[in-house]
Amino acid sequence: MADVDELEDPMEEMTSYTFARFLRSPETEAFVRNLDRPPQMPAMRYVYLYCLCEQIQEFSGETGFCDFVSSLVQENDSQDGPSLKSIYWGLQEATDEQRTVLCSYVESMTRGQSENLMWDILRNGIISSSKLLSTIKNGPTKVFEPAPISTNHYFGGPVAFGLRCEDTVKDIVCKLICGDASANRQFGFMISPTDGIFGVSLDLCVNVESQGDFILFTDRSCIYEIKCRFKYLFSKSEFDPIYPSYTALYKRPCKRSFIRFINSIARPTVEYVPDGRLPSEGDYLLTQDEAWNLKDVRKRKLGPGHDLVADSLAANRGVESMLYVMTDPSENAGRIGIKDRVPVNIFINPRHNYFYQVLLQYKIVGDYVRHSGGGKPGRDCSPRVNIVTAFFRKRSPLDPATCTLGSDLLLDASVEIPVAVLVTPVVLPDSVIRKTLSTAAGSWKAYADNTFDTAPWVPSGLFADDESTP
């Protein structure tokens, strides 16, 4: 890689220095040819990150990652710094705790997501939470060629709506539901420290601590994945088909009125699935409560090939979601609070992409807890996971100009009015996690082998039935 001082635009050079380009570089290919065995992950991922950070630290001022790697290298065999070989072997021998420190540096450097160039670059060669299901189904065809992150979203569309309302949902969870629990609301890119091929970024996590620039996850940490439902956005108007059902829910918050509200649109977000039947892939929430069975829809039986779905359904069927109905600011001097709580039998759909999204978040945060000292002896190091479904209405002339969440947290004037929040706990069986990650890792390995002459091997711990992969 060219020296930064020789580049007309070092930032432009950085944005093109992907993991794929690193693997194809003459320096890397020469280094690999001199090894007595193929290079391994995650060490090669960290070697790449070292090379990237070494180039950008001259104008970013961030030296922590490279300094920590240097402390792991036994020999400095060059006046210009350690060789790739020395760096690789230092990282190959690193402990999971040391690798987690390296990943924590990366997370701290990449906060801001779409506004952070490094966050975009690091997705190359990574199976992210949003790509996990497609990788299992179709292979990682886009993992080494991810589409650029788009920030130009139509204001009135669903993506812009979700981005606009996400902070409001975080405020509701942190202030009104969790009672001002310690929380982190902005995360960088979190690479799995033990394998280097999976990565996630969280919306919100409560019960976390700070250690300098690092986030310390604990065995009490709770992840919240936020979904703002654009298709339920409605107006306070008798001509809006959703409004009458919302009015009934607001006047009498209960299971029956919530069922009416959810089914007020053509493709409702909750699907009724009786025991022993296969859910569709249409949306991400299910129920087995007969009260939701409003129309006769024939469903296939669970059968051969549905083992993971069956295991996940069995683990989640008993889950109780909590619906929080919010007060109307036009009736409460602009104040939005929790009007009522309604428990409902709603759980996640294990055939939907969002299930795999939170599965990978659960796995990686669990790795951070185990390898960063956040877990107490004798306690499960796994975090809790919830998916949050938020419903909004458009602003009305009757709404006060200034609205607050609780008594003092100002609601941005550009954001719609939150009317209800559904919090759904997610249970992730170990067998489902192992099989899912094993399948995805095998797909990543096969694609890398066919794409790169210097493809690094994947850790054997990801392969439940394959002892041949080092």
Curated annotation (Swiss-Prot):
GO terms for cellular component: host cell cytoplasm; host cell nucleus. Its EC number is 3.1.-.-. Keywords: Decay of host mRNAs by virus, Early protein, Endonuclease, Eukaryotic host gene expression shutoff by virus, Exonuclease, Host cytoplasm, Host gene expression shutoff by virus, Host mRNA suppression by virus, Host nucleus, Host-virus interaction, Hydrolase, Nuclease, RNA-binding. InterPro entries: Herpes_alk_exo (IPR001616), Restrct_endonuc-II-like (IPR011335), Viral_alk_exo (IPR034720). GO terms for molecular function: DNA binding; endonuclease activity; exonuclease activity; RNA binding. The keyword RNA-binding applies. It is an enzyme of class 3 (hydrolase). The keyword Nuclease applies. One of its GO terms (biological process) is symbiont-mediated degradation of host mRNA. The record marks 166, 203, 225, 227 as: Required for function. It is found in: Host nucleus; Host cytoplasm. HAMAP family: HSV_AN. Belongs to the herpesviridae alkaline nuclease family. Forms a complex with the DNA polymerase, the DNA polymerase processivity factor, and the major DNA binding protein. Plays a role in processing non linear or branched viral DNA intermediates in order to promote the production of mature packaged unit-length linear progeny viral DNA molecules. Exhibits endonuclease and exonuclease activities and accepts both double-stranded and single-stranded DNA as substrate. Exonuclease digestion of DNA is in the 5'-> 3' direction and the products are 5'-monophosphate nucleosides. Additionally, forms a recombinase with the major DNA-binding protein, which displays strand exchange activity. This is Shutoff alkaline exonuclease.
